[in-house]
Amino acid sequence: MTQAREYDYIIIGAGSAGNVLATRLTEDPDVQVLLLEAGGPDYRFDFRTQMPAALAYPLQGKRYNWAFETDPEPYMNNRRMECGRGKGLGGSSLINGMCYLRGNALDYDNWAKIPGLEDWNYLQCLPYFKRAETRDIGPNDYHGGDGPVSVATPKEGNNELYGAFIRAGIEAGYPATEDVNGYQQEGFGPMDRTTTPNGRRASTARGYLDIAKQRPNLTIETHATTDVIEFEGKRAVGVSYERKGQAQRVRARREVLLCAGAIASPQILQRSGVGNPEHLEEFDIPVVHELPGVGENLQDHLEMYIQYECKKPISLYPALKWYNQPKIGAEWLFFGKGIGASNQFEAAGFIRTNDQEEWPNLQYHFLPIAISYNGKSAVQAHGFQAHVGSMRSMSRGRIRLTSRDPKAAPSILFNYMSHDKDWQEFRDAIRITREIIEQPTMDEYRGREISPGPNVQSDAELDEFVRQHAETAYHPAGSCKMGSADDAMAVVDGAGRVHGLEGLRVIDASIMPVIATGNLNAPTIMIAEKMADKVRGRDPLPPAKVDYYVANGAPARRRA
């Protein structure tokens, strides 16, 4: 057998985290990095991934989407639910909804209360959010101006339904916020998006790898499916993978960095002999290290669409007509403008359903069209919808192997809606949304309620609607959680190092101990930026010196 190739670092997964690490680590010219990606390139000529308004298309096929399904979910009428994950350079940032949302400051302050995670508080995370970002209206105390990720803000003259929805939330007694990523997340306001100034998707492949891919010390291999991490004793020393039908082995002089995401990272650990021995023995996998938390603590956001017909003919419904699409496509392709240049999620809301919640437990995305997330089942009329879901469900799931074959889909169970609080939050979500849409500012727009429909009112009727119609927001997290070695279910420490092993870190959304309040792409990029300094042995960026909103007992809603 030929001598295995050697690199200083081997990164598994060219997604939202892996591309950040590849770019930061190769800033040191004498560090050799191999980046392995099971999917293909992010073809820049493919409008399905590059046009923001086409965001539904990559979810429909399997070129860019692993398209996993859950096991039958016991609290959801045993539905097998979608679990889409990005495949290709950029990972899930290549197929996500491009919502740039960082989470709430108290998410991170609460992580920092966990022993060993003291440096994960908000003020120590904020500099890394800023380092990653270039915001189109320039930097400030909360936002960056020269980072790899392009962030666009909503502009004057966008669809009038966005402003109407924000005003309706405020009329209903909830706060207003100028910037859900700034001083105050709580309230209704505009939503930023990860798109470039010329209207292209700002994936981490475009943002980070475009900087790094010409460097001689970075090797990128696509169509490279990782089989196992190889160990000598308790030290990770390399990776076995398959590329174009050929088995390959590479060695890591320093570390293996596992960045395959909340679904694949625990699978790879389990295949490699790291996990719960009972599960590994089912597949005759020799145990390298017993870590029962691998694949446990799995979390996600569940959401519903509350849909209405729109009385004014101003929704995006005409954009679905085939005869309008060539003009929209040309305007986007040649000028980077128009409907095609936006993901259409330009209004947000984060609210507390009661005064006891310390920070928001519901999230809204507003869309000026009535359609499902994956682009199917569009309502054939002018309409609008509010996506709403609970933020920090106590429900926990797990990921298990079904086979030693790296191409086999895992067994995924989220245990959605397994707590009483989940049901109360979703009942509240539907009722509060109806109250918001009933506000006077919506009178000129509000038509018939399409979904759930005006006859769905009682707790039992609302619960059945949730069981039948709630969908994933595509935010899996937590399956290799950070924590101290004293926590038997923690998989990594605060620097991403796998407990009990050497030369191996996990750096992606799987290490979140508790899911963030919002979409997960921006937090995952931040985690990778912060971890890059730890891997490189660099001093952390100085903590931010800013104020941030804490409700501190303030009422969740102002009553008229």
Curated annotation (Swiss-Prot):
Instruction: Give GO MF terms, alphabetically.
Output: betaine-aldehyde dehydrogenase (NAD+) activity; choline dehydrogenase activity; flavin adenine dinucleotide binding
EC number in record: 1.1.99.1, 1.2.1.8
Q: Which cofactor does it need?
A: FAD
The active site lies at H475
Gene Ontology process terms (BP): glycine betaine biosynthetic process from choline
Annotated Pfam families: GMC_oxred_C, GMC_oxred_N
Q: Which GO terms describe its cellular component?
A: membrane
Protein family? Belongs to the GMC oxidoreductase family.
Which PANTHER family does the entry mention?
A: CHOLINE DEHYDROGENASE, MITOCHONDRIAL, GLUCOSE-METHANOL-CHOLINE GMC OXIDOREDUCTASE
Q: What is this protein called?
A: Oxygen-dependent choline dehydrogenase 1
The upper taxonomy is:
Bacteria, Pseudomonadati, Pseudomonadota, Gammaproteobacteria, Oceanospirillales
